[in-house]
Amino acid sequence: MNNKLKVLRAMRNWSQAELADRLDVSRQAVNAIETGKYDPSLPLAFKLARLFEMRIEEIFDDGEGHDDEK
């Protein structure tokens, strides 16, 4: 799953370890999410959304290219 986590983290000048501490996960978990090797659990996705004050879908993109139906 594509995500903007690395960009959002960099905008705040946080290291992976600092973000991991804020989320109560390992630095390796943050790295795996950033590189698309691991998709976060729903509770973790909500934590990320709250931390960055964004909606989950603003952070994560499933790559499906869904358009809103009109």
Positions of predicted regions on the chain:
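Short basic helix-loop element that most often maps to the first helix and adjoining turn
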Residues: 3-22
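Short, basic-rich loop-to-helix N-cap that marks the start of a DNA-contacting helix
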Residues: 37-47, 66
